[in-house]
Design a protein with these regions (language model features):
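Short aromatic/hydrophobic "clamp" motif used to bind/position activated sugar donors
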Residues: 87
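Glycine-rich, basic loop-to-helix element that forms the pyrophosphate-binding segment
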Residues: 64-82, 103
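Conserved donor NDP-sugar-binding/catalytic core segment of glycosyltransferases
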Residues: 98-124
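The conserved acidic donor/metal-binding loop of glycosyltransferases
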Residues: 91-95
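Cell-envelope/extracellular polymer assembly enzymes that use nucleotide-activated donors
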Residues: 6-8, 37
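A conserved acidic beta->alpha catalytic loop
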Residues: 26, 42-51, 67
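Short beta-strand/loop segment that forms part of the nucleotide-sugar
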Residues: 35-44, 63-65
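Short, acidic, metal-binding catalytic loop of nucleotide-sugar glycosyltransferases
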Residues: 25-35
Length: 124
């Protein structure tokens, strides 16, 4: 029995407030097939973007880092806070076009030899 969301979407924000808001909105508008949480790690932006994001999106978990820990370090902070069964690391300048998450989960669950899955990514 899962006591948390199926998926934790984790993204890093470093002076990318607009991009991060667009990502959050695309997740909220497109992902309906699974339960999920969104975690935004503010990687020491000039302005405290975690506070602004939390005010606009109260359901989003925000983490403020006093120092820029880079991509790996920022994601590690997000993963420590994650409650999901699956972790989905996603760049904040990504836009979700469709809900294919359930397909990825189905593949992972039906093939235990698979350790990771990723959707097709197109560059704009």
């Amino acid at each position: 029995m899962i006591n948390g969301p199926q998926v934790s979407f984790i993204t890093i924000c470093y002076n990318g407030f607009k991009d991060t808001c667009e990502l959050i909105e695309s997740l909220q508008n497109k992902i309906h097939s699974v339960s999920y949480e969104i975690i935004v790690v503010d990687n020491a932006s000039r302005e405290d973007e975690a506070v602004k994001i939390q005010a606009l999106y109260p359901s989003v978990t925000t983490i403020h880092s006093d120092e820029n820990k880079g991509f790996s370090g920022g994601n590690n902070l997000g993963m420590k806070a994650a409650r999901g069964q699956y972790l989905f690391l996603i760049n904040n300048d990504t836009y979700i076009e469709s809900d294919g998450i359930a397909y990825l989960i189905e593949r992972l669950e039906s093939h235990p030899e698979i350790g990771a899955a990723s959707p097709k990514i197109r560059f704009a």
